Regions:
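Membrane-interface "cap" regions at the ends of multi-pass membrane proteins
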Residues: 1-33, 39-41, 57-61, 73, ...
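Helix-loop-helix junctions that connect adjacent transmembrane segments
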Residues: 2-8, 45-46, 50, 125-139, ...
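Hydrophobic transmembrane alpha-helices that form the core helical bundles
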Residues: 40, 48, 57-148, 305-326, ...
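TM-loop-TM module centered on a large, flexible mid-protein loop between adjacent transmembrane helices
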Residues: 78-79, 85, 117-122, 200, ...
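Hydrophobic alpha-helical segments and their helix-loop junctions in multi-pass secondary transporters
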Residues: 113-120, 171-199, 261-269, 383-398, ...
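C-terminal membrane-solvent junction of multi-pass transporters and transport-like membrane proteins
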Residues: 136-139, 337-346, 383-430
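Membrane-interface loop-to-helix entry segments
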Residues: 136-190, 245-249, 372-385, 411-414, ...
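Intrinsically disordered or low-complexity boundary/linker segments at protein termini
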Residues: 182-186, 447-492, 498-499, 509, ...
Length: 743
């Protein structure tokens, strides 16, 4: 949930953070799935939950390591964005957002189902008979929608939505249920053989039945992932996120295992637990509680169900809203979804959108069970991915995480493999779940490619420039080629290279091209090579001064520009940084034009005094004719420049005086969007109406420390050097960066 003051958002302590996980995990899963599991595998359901608990704790270890390293909202989406590509991050965020929405739908309907017997009992206490419609589909939808709207409203007022009281209430109810059950067991303690007999046969269908039960019931423990979804709200996240996740799963297991034991030991009413479960698996827990505590036991389960469904609903609405708001901040969802409440504490627009999606699925999707299977499948697949990301990040990261999972790399390998196996089982058991997940992902791919990709890639490029560790975490080591011809320019070029290719992440290759001497003398270096060594020696000295460790290369060629092209085509650098003294038409339309035409890489051209330093660029001017052809490289450069110091970045649009007001407003909106995407927090947009574009930009350039001009490429690798941009470059004297996005 992005805000302008991230520290102010960290309002959740250990107890509140644990409450998010406990609220999402405890109650709903066991009440809905215990009966199905007992039918499938008998008393070994206890073992199935215990084994799932081990898998969950291994997954918690990977989640906790990533959550403490990246204490931001967004959870699994954020992890994918840090370690993979923006496209992969969108895919993860898109499906997990949907999975959380569907989970919220299931819990809203679960609340409605548990509310019906309460209403029926209320009518009975009032001396009347409950009408049949109170349990009909329309009434269930009304109850469910009311719960969704209530939590959406409460979350817009408070980051936690007041759900902690519901969580505390259900823990108290489950505690009373367990206490009552064990008192009954102790008061009428059977002999050991009799007690053991109630658990026989332990396996109803052998190992296959146990595996099936594990596949069915793992979702009863998966809510711990919602903790990292709100990681940006957690105080002292390096300490509290790992503890809260472990406490959440531990609390769930401390309730589930004893409750399952009591169901078999004292809750079957004299028949086998499998027979009792087969009668009505959905309400097995309630029937078992009635058997060992009478009517109070039944109503305790109903109350536990109501509170469990409400707390899980609240946790999923909170997490889904957090996913949506974080994705909007990265432009992997439309920017307007990032909108905050008036006090800046909650993502109001994302909450409204999420509530609307939940309501739509409630009303429009008749087969909610299939949708629930999709949710389970997505979570399992994403959990397997998180294990893989945890492994990659541990291997690639420069600094250790505040929390590191034990037994590395066994935990991510084994945990990821088990989660993947459960996901494949789920896909095979419910084929429609895989189909629905694929359809949702395909719809997202169309949305991303047609609408979201340009802005998302720009923001991602800016993020890589601002935080170079992203490049390292993604397993890349970009190469920057820096041809050096003039020893006086070597220092400023190295400083610029260090700004856009920081040490420890990128590689820099210094290149000096020497014309072959007319005559070689044995035992003596030609003057040309001696001069080249001096040039590279000066560049290397400047590089060492800024702790950069570049490669150095000297080549021989009669045509330096053609040689630069050849080296670029061979080494395939991510960018070429060129330094020029004076820019004139013969260079721009000649060798420079041919170089840009023949290489498929980003081009950065620097014109600056020899004593200039990028740190001096406090005020940056970006003339723009609109469009996003140069946005990714410009965003990356601006991100690099704003990494160490805050800059004032002005995007300048100059329109003809004859342009009508509606076109001016449209241009202003577009330029403001560019400024937000490329220089968030430091960019402003200025739109003027002047007939002399060049004169206006030249006048403004006198007040800036650096100007950035984009050189458009049209067609395959072609640059357009003519027109106003070249005129501006030739008419100004301020430090200048000209950039050209790869073709």
């Amino acid at each position: 949930m992005p805000t302008d003051s991230p520290d102010a958002r960290r309002t959740l302590g250990l107890a509140a953070t644990t409450g998010v996980g406990v609220g999402a995990i405890v109650g709903g899963g066991i009440l809905a799935l215990a009966g199905v599991s007992f039918v499938t595998t008998g008393p070994s359901t206890i073992l199935a939950f215990a084994l799932n608990g081990i898998i969950a704790l291994m997954t918690v270890a990977s989640f906790a390591e990533l959550g403490s390293r990246f204490p931001e909202s967004g959870g699994t989406y954020t992890f994918a964005r840090k370690a993979l590509t923006v496209e992969a991050a969108f895919a993860v965020g898109w499906v997990v957002w949907f999975a959380s929405v569907v989970a919220a739908v299931l819990y809203a309907l679960g609340f409605a189902v548990f509310l019906v017997p309460v209403l029926q009992q209320a009518f009975a206490l009032l001396g009347g008979e409950a009408p049949t419609w109170i349990g009909g589909r329309f009434a269930l939808l009304v109850y469910a929608l009311a719960a969704v709207m209530f939590y959406a409203w409460s979350l817009m007022r408070s980051p936690t939505g007041g759900g902690q009281w519901t969580t505390i209430g259900k823990l108290v109810v489950f505690g009373l249920l367990l206490l009552g059950g064990f008192l009954v067991l102790v008061s009428d303690l059977p002999s050991l053989p009799e007690l053991v007999g109630r658990f026989s046969p332990f396996f109803e269908d052998g190992a296959s039945g146990l595996a099936q039960a594990m596949g069915y019931t793992f979702i009863a423990l998966q809510g711990f992932g919602l903790i990292v979804a709100v990681g940006g709200n957690v105080k002292d996240p390096g300490r509290n996120i790992p503890r809260a996740m472990a406490l959440s799963v531990g609390t769930a297991l401390a309730i589930y295992i004893p409750l399952l034991f009591l169901i078999v030991a004292v809750g079957t009413g004299g028949q086998s637990v499998v027979a009792l479960a087969e009668e009505n698996p959905e309400i097995l827990v309630a029937n078992a509680a009635r058997n060992f505590l009478g009517a109070p036991g039944y109503w305790l389960v109903v109350l536990a169900g109501l509170l469990s469904m409400l707390s899980a609903l609240q946790a999923n609405v909170l997490a889904a809203s957090s996913f949506a708001a974080t994705m909007a901040a990265d432009r992997t969802l439309p920017l307007r979804i990032e909108g905050l409440s008036p006090d800046g504490r909650t993502p109001a627009v994302a909450i409204k959108l999420t509530a609307g999606m939940i309501a739509f699925v409630l009303v429009a999707v008749p087969d909610v069970a299939a949708a629930g299977a999709v949710s389970s499948l997505i979570f399992l697949g994403v959990f397997a991915l998180v294990h893989g990301i945890a492994y990659l990040v541990r291997k690639r990261a420069f600094q250790p995480s505040p929390y590191q999972s034990p037994f590395f790399p066994m935990v991510p390998w084994v945990g990821g493999g088990l989660c993947l196996a459960l996901a494949l089982y789920q896909a095979a058991a419910v084929p429609s779940a895989g189909v629905l997940a694929a359809l949702w992902l395909a719809a997202g791919a169309v949305l991303f490619v047609t609408h979201l990709a340009p802005r998302a890639r720009v923001v991602d490029a800016r993020s890589e420039g601002f935080d170079p560790q992203l490049i390292r975490l993604r397993g890349r080591s970009p190469l920057i080629l820096v041809p050096v011809a003039n020893p006086e320019n070597a220092g400023v070029l190295v400083k610029m290279a260090e700004a856009i290719a920081p040490k420890g992440v990128s590689r820099t290759q210094l290149l000096s091209v020497v014309r072959p001497p007319a005559k070689w003398e044995d035992g003596k270096l030609p003057t040309e090579l001696v001069d080249a060594q001096g040039i590279l020696g000066g560049a290397l000295s400047a590089a060492i001064a800024v702790d950069l460790r570049p490669e150095a290369l000297i080549t021989l060629s009669d045509d330096p520009w053609a040689e630069i092209t050849r080296i670029a085509q061979r080494s395939r650098p991510d960018a070429i940084l060129l330094g020029i003294g004076e820019l004139h038409q013969s260079i721009a339309a000649g060798p420079l034009e041919r170089l840009i035409d023949r290489v498929s890489t980003d081009i950065v051209i620097l014109r600056a005094p020899t004593d200039w330093d990028p740190d001096q660029a406090a005020r940056i001017l970006v003339p723009s004719r609109g469009g996003r052809a140069q946005s990714p490289i410009r965003a990356r450069v601006l991100g690099s420049l704003t990494r160490e110091a805050r800059r004032e970045v002005t995007f300048l649009g100059v329109l003809r005086e004859s342009m009508d007001s509606s076109a001016v407003r449209a241009s202003e909106r577009e330029l403001k969007a560019l400024a937000r995407d490329e220089a968030r927090g430091s960019g402003t947009a200025v739109v003027l109406q002047r007939d002399d574009l060049v004169a206006e930009v030249v006048q403004r350039s006198r007040e800036c420390d650096l100007m950035i001009l984009g050189l458009r490429r049209s067609g395959r690798g072609r640059s357009v050097f003519g027109g106003p941009m070249l005129d501006i470059a030739m008419a100004t004297s301020c430090p200048l960066l000209m950039i050209s996005q790869r073709g």
